[in-house]
Amino acid sequence: LPLAGPANRQARLAADSMAGGGRAYRGVIGTAALKVFGRTAAATGQNERALQAAGLKYGEDYRFTVIFPRHHVTYYPGAQEIALKLIFRTSDGVILGAQAIGAEGVDKRIDVIAAAIGQSLTVADLQEFELSYAPPYSAAKDPVNMAGYAAENILQGRSVPLLPRELAAEVAAGAMLIDVRPPEEYH
């Protein structure tokens, strides 16, 4: 976790306190980004490992969605895929964490989700975010909005996720796996 941001916020709070004002330090959410071989990896909030270490259980206490949107509209040249995982509380949809990786736009999306976590917002709130839009930068439905829609679908029972570790058992029990993606999305 990069400490420059938290250190500067603490310094400001200390200075405010010495000047007669002051607020309590709210701690850190844990937001970071780094460049790895031409890609940006970023995260904010809690990841699954931290939640499980705290005794929380997938499905019961938290769920997640993983989406693969483009960082801007696909008709504009250069649209790059982002892999975005959003973790949320099962009981009320409060956002707990997110991780993303991609060539472009990853830091922007993680920063927006970090702000949502800092305000204890829900996946439904993400759907309503009005984010800047222009074809070179985003889509009318930004990846942040799309993550909110996907998570809300899970909470409302409109979408039932199947984890990779569950797939083999489902296929063995007779389930059929059908890939409905168009050829240009299959890679």
Where does each model-flagged region fall?
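Short loop/helix-cap segments at secondary-structure boundaries that form the rim of catalytic
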Residues: 186-187
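Short hydrophobic beta-strand that contains or immediately precedes a catalytic carboxylate
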Residues: 176-181
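A short, polar/charged loop-to-alpha-helix boundary motif
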Residues: 104-123
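Generic alpha-helical structural context detector
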Residues: 16, 114-115, 128, 149
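Mid-to-C-terminal Rossmann-like scaffold of FAD/NAD(P)H-dependent oxidoreductases
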Residues: 1-104, 139, 143-169, 175
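Catalytic P-loop NTP-binding/switch module of NTPases
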Residues: 123-129
